[in-house]
From Swiss-Prot:
Residue positions where Phosphohistidine is found in the record: 163
Entry superkingdom: Bacteria
Name of this chain's protein: Adaptive-response sensory kinase SasA
Domain Histidine kinase: 160-382
Length: 382
């Protein structure tokens, strides 16, 4: 014989389900990141008698869209999605932070429980079907943004081909024609110096074109597919030394001095070495391009915090106006002072993509007439 449902028991069950703290723990592939999972689970187990808690562990390489959705800047990170408002905890002491905030979250959950049914239903947040719908809407928005970026990128490439690539090609062509006219003349000392200068100019222009083509190809690859990131422990002092050595001839040619402030005890970073090499090369290329003969360039590396290492490339060039300092990272944005040069091109836009995929930051400090300093951060390998 079937017994009638116990409405009181059902109500209690529904009440318990609604009064549940929901947490998302974001971790990366580093062993040190996974070490936080069990201590957090152990603490939640000890306090779950007071209130049920739902903990979901998310591998950031499997769901990168959620990392961007919650605007995370470091891992591991613990995100409280219910009760509202959303809150993010990050750092090396997640368990202590959780102990501090748990009583406040319980209090907030109890207050929300006594609100209207409509308000409570809105606080269900990111569970079940609503979570899936939210993710789907977010993905569709990202797809739309990616398509718009690709269309914009095509316009940028056309603009680059029309101006940036044509300018060095014209200069190299003029130099070659001048050499051809001078080849049948008697080689005087003055003509020999001129010939050497023309060869040097031609070589520099070909170098500019090669860099532009490399930027276009790499940027095109990153626009049409996700950057392939293979993160390992990278030692920046060794990497920076390798990069600087390849600039010796160019620095001598422009009478530039490159100062390195790179402590050898800087901890390793968690990064893709080739992508970070590309960022540093791009920043040094720009510094050399905008620094006049006899100027100075500084490459420095600083262990900024226990979790971050900062790399800086500074020059004594003309500087960048404050209102333009953010826009130079927006693809093919051209400063007024770039009209006589090949411009920043797509390089800085690509640098920002690379640093963001490493959960770092990139920015510029500059005063017109006093040079520029480009900085970026990377997570310490643990």
């Amino acid at each position: 014989m079937l017994e009638p449902p116990n409405h009181q028991t059902t109500a209690k069950t529904d009440q318990a389900a609604s009064m549940s703290i929901q947490l998302l723990l974001f971790v990366d592939e580093r062993p040190s990141s996974h070490e936080y999972i069990q201590p957090i689970r152990d603490y939640i187990k000890t306090v779950s008698q007071d209130c049920p808690c739902q903990l979901e562990v998310i591998e950031i390489h499997e769901q990168p869209h959620l990392v961007e959705h919650f605007r995370l800047v470091a891992t591991p990170a613990l995100v409280k999605v219910v009760p509202e408002p959303r809150q993010t905890l990050a750092g090396s002491n997640l368990v202590n932070q959780l102990k501090k905030w748990w009583p406040k979250w319980l209090s907030s959950l109890e207050e929300n429980h006594h609100d209207s049914l409509l308000e409570k239903s809105s606080n269900v947040g990111y569970s079940g079907e609503l979570m899936r719908l939210s993710d789907e809407i977010f993905r569709l928005k990202k797809d739309k943004e990616n398509l718009q970026e690709q269309l914009k990128f095509k316009d940028q490439v056309l603009a680059m081909l029309a101006h940036d690539l044509r300018s060095p090609l014209t200069a190299a062509s003029i130099a070659v024609e001048t050499l051809e006219l001078a080849k049948n003349q008697d080689p005087t000392e003055k003509q020999q110096k001129l010939t050497a200068q023309l060869f040097n100019q031609t070589r520099n222009q070909f170098r500019v074109m090669n860099r532009l083509i490399t930027d276009i190809l790499q940027a095109s690859k990153s626009m049409n597919a996700q950057l392939q990131v293979h993160q390992t422990e990278v030692f920046l002092p060794r990497l920076s030394k390798e990069i600087v050595e390849q600039y010796n001839d160019l620095l001598t040619e422009k009478s530039l001095k490159l100062i390195q402030d790179v402590p050898q005890d800087v901890p390793g970073v968690y990064a893709d070495e080739e992508l970070i090499r590309q960022v540093i090369v791009n920043l040094i290329d720009n510094a050399i391009k905008y620094t006049s003969e006899g100027g100075e360039i500084t490459l420095s590396i600083l262990h900024r915090t226990s979790q971050k290492v900062q790399v800086s490339v500074c020059d004594t060039g003309p500087g960048i106006p404050e209102e333009k300092q953010e826009r130079i990272f927006e693809g093919h944005f051209r400063l007024q002072r770039d009209q006589g040069k090949e411009g920043y091109g797509l390089g800085l836009s690509l640098c920002r993509k690379i640093i963001r995929v490493h959960y770092g930051q990139i920015w510029v400090d500059s005063v017109p007439g006093q040079g520029s300093c480009f900085h970026f951060t990377l997570p310490v390998y643990r």
